[in-house]
Swiss-Prot record:
It is linked to Mitochondrial complex I deficiency, nuclear type 4: A form of mitochondrial complex I deficiency, the most common biochemical signature of mitochondrial disorders, a group of highly heterogeneous conditions characterized by defective oxidative phosphorylation, which collectively affects 1 in 5-10000 live births. Clinical disorders have variable severity, ranging from lethal neonatal disease to adult-onset neurodegenerative disorders. It catalyses: a ubiquinone + NADH + 5 H(+)(in) = a ubiquinol + NAD(+) + 4 H(+)(out). Belongs to the complex I 51 kDa subunit family. The modification N6-acetyllysine is found at residues 81, 104, 375. Residues 1-20 form a transit peptide. It is an enzyme of class 7 (translocase). The gene is NDUFV1. This is NADH dehydrogenase [ubiquinone] flavoprotein 1, mitochondrial. Core subunit of the mitochondrial membrane respiratory chain NADH dehydrogenase (Complex I) which catalyzes electron transfer from NADH through the respiratory chain, using ubiquinone as an electron acceptor. Part of the peripheral arm of the enzyme, where the electrons from NADH are accepted by flavin mononucleotide (FMN) and then passed along a chain of iron-sulfur clusters by electron tunnelling to the final acceptor ubiquinone. Contains FMN, which is the initial electron acceptor as well as one iron-sulfur cluster. GO terms for cellular component: mitochondrial inner membrane; mitochondrion; respiratory chain complex I. Core subunit of respiratory chain NADH dehydrogenase (Complex I) which is composed of 45 different subunits. This is a component of the flavoprotein-sulfur (FP) fragment of the enzyme. Interacts with RAB5IF. One of its GO terms (molecular function) is 4 iron, 4 sulfur cluster binding. NCBIfam families: nuoF_fam, PRK13596.1.
Length: 464
């Protein structure tokens, strides 16, 4: 998802201290993965059970929600901070800290929670599984998150193409209202909280939080300059927090089972469980919930049935959705699937959408296709993105044929660096990073293709 992010280097405001899950005296874990069924938060990920209210209640949703609400915002925020939960939409920003930005003295304006369900990142399909098969878990998360930040209502902005998901969500909202779980005096807690659904229109750019807010307000989905940040001036000019579907949906379970329980999974600063999408050249593509910091190789071999043709047939993996740089097989052997480990590997966790490519893949053509996507989805507001991504798209089309000179590889790298970090939102970064990953790890393939094209061109000239 096009997040509110700079994936490879987010920073915190000055004088803000963050407590991550690893700030304890407990012995550090050294192995990760093999999540037990009793520790899974999403128990209907594959839609094998009833997704309506009756089925959700039987699986533990809405259990003692009233007690959670009555404990108040400070307690909820404390548990979220203790858990070490970081944003699951790509940014990886500490959720407890982000939600606490809303807890300022009221100036009379209502506060809102906006849930980003505009899942448009190629390769990513985790949030739609929650919307389709566990909508009540999301609604309960909206209520708990809204209580934590004193929000009056939640707006769930759902991708326009998600027709069935939106339909299920609307049914779940109606059930929750009829049961008194949301609305006036939600769960009998004395807290009033409404939930509204807003349908998108198929624009990838609206996955960026301020473009999403613009779209909710009925305007063109174009990112806003920041500051002011949404926590000060968001939807309808009111304080707003924009959060990912998965981030919101796990919050009630964290409050019920305790932040310390959630922090017990994964490495320091990378705690909890996570939904991973595994697609591409694997035997059994799937969406699976696993422990953070699970080895990438184990994730593919255990849950997706392995790479087609065996592990030795692996060429490269895009580990976090199309906007994250690819990594070759040599890196995939040992890398862990969490924020910090993938940053060290010069890529990112992103949305944890693992795209596997075997040796049959034309890696240059694959990356060129991604650049074409970003060129198509650019809103055109920023010159580096509008002009730079269009230029990269044209150059990559020539690179696919080999119709270029080796010196142009360096020019492409330089242009990608000029786009990165010089745009209002992160779409420019998302277009630049796949190119950088390709050049970093597959430059010899580019040069060989150019050499082959030049030889064929010379042969044709000689023949004529």
């Amino acid at each position: 998802m096009l997040a509110t992010r700079r994936l490879l280097g987010w920073s915190l405001p000055a004088r803000v201290s963050v407590r991550f899950s690893g700030d304890t005296t407990a012995p550090k874990k050294t192995s990760f993965g093999s999540l037990k069924d009793e520790d899974r938060i999403f128990t209907n990920l594959y839609g094998r059970h009833d997704w309506r209210l009756k089925g959700s209640l039987s699986r533990g949703d809405w259990y003692k929600t009233k007690e959670i609400l009555l404990k108040g915002p400070d307690w909820i925020l404390g548990e979220i901070k203790t858990s070490g939960l970081r944003g699951r939409g790509g940014a990886g920003f500490p959720t407890g800290l982000k939600w606490s930005f809303m807890n300022k003295p009221s100036d009379g304006r209502p506060k809102y929670l906006v849930v980003n369900a505009d899942e448009g990142e190629p390769g990513t399909c985790k949030d739609r599984e929650i919307l389709r098969h566990d909508p009540h878990k999301l609604l309960e998360g909206c209520l708990v998150g809204g209580r934590a930040m004193g929000a009056r209502a939640a707006y769930i902005y759902i991708r326009g193409e998600f027709y069935n998901e939106a339909s299920n969500l609307q049914v779940a909202i109606r059930e929750a209202y009829e049961a008194g779980l949301i609305g006036k005096n939600a769960c009998g807690s004395g807290y009033d909280f409404d939930v509204f659904v807003v349908r998108g229109a198929g624009a990838y750019i609206c996955g960026e939080e301020t473009a999403l807010i613009e779209s909710i307000e009925g305007k063109q989905g174009k990112p806003r300059l920041k500051p002011p940040f949404p926590a000060d001036v968001g939807v309808f000019g009111c304080p707003t927090t924009v959060a990912n579907v998965e981030t919101v949906a796990v919050s009630p379970t964290i409050c019920r089972r305790g932040g310390t329980w959630f922090a017990g999974f994964g490495r320091e600063r990378n705690s909890g469980t996570k939904l991973f999408n595994i697609s591409g050249h694997v035997n059994h593509p799937c969406t699976v919930e696993e422990e953070m910091s699970v080895p990438l190789k184990e994730l593919i071999e255990k849950h997706a049935g392995g790479v087609t043709g065996g592990w030795d047939n692996l060429l490269a993996v895009i580990p976090g959705g199309s906007s994250t740089p690819l990594i070759p097989k040599s890196v995939c052997e040992t890398v862990l699937m969490d924020f910090d480990a993938l940053v060290q590997a010069q890529t990112g966790l992103g949305t944890a959408a693992v795209i596997v490519m075997d040796r049959s893949t034309d890696i240059v053509k694959a990356i060129a296709r991604l650049i074409e996507f970003y060129k198509h989805e650019s809103c055109g507001q920023c010159t580096p993105c509008r002009e730079g991504v269009d230029w990269m798209n044209k150059v990559m089309a020539r690179f696919v044929r080999g119709d270029a000179r080796p010196a142009e590889i360096d020019s492409l790298w330089e242009i990608s660096k000029q786009i990165e970090g010089h745009t209002i939102c992160a779409l420019g970064d998302g277009a630049a990073w796949p190119v950088q990953g390709l050049i970093r790890h597959f430059r010899p393939e580019l040069e060989e293709r150019m050499q082959r094209f030049a030889q064929q061109h010379q042969a044709r000239q000689a023949a004529s």
